[in-house]
C-alpha cells in the first residue's frame, strides 16, 4: 500500500502496537515515547488499505527466532511507526552574513533544540551495517554583530555536478 495513514477507529490499536514495538523489538527496547497518533490518523487519506503496521500478534512472537531479513523489515516498519508518531524534531536555524572588501558572504547553520523522532531514526541507522551518508548539520561558531575576524584563510575551488543516472531495466 502507498497509504501513510490509518483510520480513526485504529487509534487504540496503534497505541497498543507502539507499546509492543518498544517492548518486543530489541533495537527499540530503551525507547520511550508519547505517541501523537493524530498525525497519522485521517480517514480521508486512507486509500484502499491503511498504512502498514505490525500487528498485536507481535507480542506473542520470539523476534530473535525470525530470519535476519525479516527482523530487518520488522525493525524498519517499527522505526517508521515510531518516527511518524514521535515527538517533533525542532531546531534553530541561524544565518550569518559577513562582509569583506565589499563582498558579502553568507552561511547558515542549525542547532538542534529537541531531537524528537530523529533520535529513533538515528538509532535505526546506527544498527545498519552500511551507514547512509547524511548531511551533517552545520554548526556555526559563536559570533556577534560587529566582530572582526582576523587571519581567515580562504581558497577558490571549482566543482562540477552531474545529474543522477536515469533508471534502466538493466
Give the location of each predicted region:
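Core catalytic DNA strand-manipulation module of type IA topoisomerases
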Residues: 1-170
Amino acid at each position: 500500500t502507498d497509504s501513510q495513514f490509518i483510520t480513526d477507529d485504529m487509534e487504540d490499536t496503534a497505541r497498543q502496537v507502539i507499546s509492543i514495538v518498544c517492548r518486543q523489538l530489541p533495537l527499540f527496547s530503551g525507547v520511550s515515547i508519547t505517541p501523537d497518533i493524530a498525525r497519522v490518523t485521517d480517514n480521508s487519506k486512507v486509500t484502499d488499505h491503511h498504512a502498514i503496521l505490525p500487528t498485536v500478534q507481535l507480542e506473542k512472537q520470539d523476534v530473535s527466532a525470525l530470519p535476519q531479513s525479516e527482523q530487518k523489515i520488522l525493525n524498519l516498519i517499527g522505526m517508521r511507526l515510531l518516527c511518524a508518531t514521535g515527538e517533533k524534531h525542532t531546531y534553530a536555524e541561524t544565518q550569518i552574513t559577513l562582509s569583506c572588501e565589499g563582498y558579502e558572504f553568507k552561511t547558515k547553520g542549525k542547532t538542534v533544540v529537541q531531537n524528537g523522532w530523529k533520535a529513533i531514526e538515528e538509532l535505526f541507522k546506527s544498527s545498519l551495517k552500511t551507514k547512509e551518508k547524511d548531511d551533517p548539520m552545520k554548526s556555526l561558531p559563536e559570533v556577534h554583530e560587529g566582530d572582526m575576524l582576523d587571519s581567515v584563510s580562504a581558497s577558490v575551488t571549482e566543482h562540477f555536478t552531474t545529474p543522477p543516472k536515469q533508471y534502466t531495466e538493466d
